[in-house]
Regions:
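Walker A (P-loop) ATP-phosphate-binding motif of ABC ATPase nucleotide-binding domains
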Residues: 2
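P-loop (Walker A) phosphate-binding loop of NTP-binding proteins
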Residues: 8
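Small-molecule kinase domains that catalyze NTP-dependent phosphoryl transfer to phosphate-bearing small molecules
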Residues: 100-146
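Hydrophobic anchor at the beta1->P-loop junction of P-loop NTPases
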Residues: 5
Length: 146
């Protein structure tokens, strides 16, 4: 399974992904983080093309790891809906898009992505305002989360 956590910088995507792996003992999971992908592939381009390239690299890596029977959690802004939707269509029921958001600015306002496109269909919604990380994890894995 691939869990694709998308949302603005500072919304809690990486915190949530790391907690899932560490606190819930999902040791066989692989975590792909947007900052790590940028560092690994030396992509410092924050233009639309640079962001799309970063997302594509993460998608390719997630698909590869999934093909090797790894569960993957991706924490990445991935601002463009069309790109996320195409990957969801390609992966079918093997991917769950999770929109992580907050109304708080958490020290990353300089990284705010003006053209971020929120999901509108077939996604799980997690608002990290006034909620503990464990509560977010429980919500994420709840069968009733839509």
């Amino acid at each position: 399974m691939i869990y694709w956590l998308t949302g603005q910088p500072g919304s809690g995507k990486t915190t949530l992904a790391k907690a899932i792996i560490k606190e819930r003992f999902f040791r066989d999971w692989f975590h792909i983080d947007g900052d790590d992908i940028r560092e690994l592939f030396d992509n410092k381009d924050y233009s639309k093309e640079g962001r799309m390239k970063n997302v594509l690299l993460a998608q390719q890596l997630a698909q590869y790891l999934h093909s090797k029977d790894k569960d993957v959690i991706v924490s990445l802004v991935s601002p463009y809906k069309e790109q996320r939707e195409a990957f969801k269509e390609k992966m079918g029921d093997m991917i769950k898009e999770v929109y992580v958001h907050t109304s708080e600015v958490r020290g990353r306002e300089n990284f705010f992505v003006e053209d971020y496109e929120q999901p509108t269909e077939n996604y799980a919604d997690i608002c990290t305002d006034n909620i503990l990380v464990d509560e977010c994890i429980n919500k994420l894995f709840s069968p009733s989360l839509k």
